[in-house]
């Protein structure tokens, strides 16, 4: 794989791998892509480079952020306000927040404090250092493990447990219930409901109303 790294993702590659290798390449996390309920499916490193704009060089930031923060960051750097209307169509407010504050101050309190995740019924919610999630199905499983309402939720303290290993659901049921309720609030606000947990059926154009 390393010998062909530059070809990965190009027209001569088929960038899929067996489940075992998928898990291995997502270390130190336990799950893979498609798993919205695990950082192995959602978490990636990010490099920010702006020689004319950043005094910090080669430093690490640990504030929690999401890909939806990129647009807000670019707009702030360019000193451009978000568009309120495009071609007469009113625009929704940006979900994300700019990350420039973290570049300027490594000790600044994080500003992206809540983020939901959902894919194929796998769900997760990050909130102020906590992460709750439920595994509805593995990527290689074509049927759910149980009904959505019967899924088992887990709870993790992200700033103390980077790899999501120590499930605190049993010792902190109040916090877990709080995050489960918050997930439903965020899901409703972002048009996630009703949750569609189908897999193979969703790639059938006839089911999606398109040719």
Language model features with spans:
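Intrinsically disordered, low-complexity polar regions and short flexible loop motifs
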Residues: 161
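A contiguous, mid-protein "functional segment" used to position or interact
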Residues: 173-192
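Active-site-adjacent bridging/hinge elements
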Residues: 42-50
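Extracellular/periplasmic ectodomains of large secreted or surface enzymes and adhesion receptors
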Residues: 167, 185-187, 198-211
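Catalytic cores of eukaryotic secretory-pathway lumenal/extracellular enzymes that build
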Residues: 2-3, 7, 35
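Active-site-proximal N-terminal segment of extracellular/periplasmic enzymes that hydrolyze or transfer
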Residues: 166-174
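C-terminal cap/loop subdomain of S1 sulfatases and analogous C-terminal strand-loop tails that border
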Residues: 10-39, 54-63, 67-158, 190-193, ...
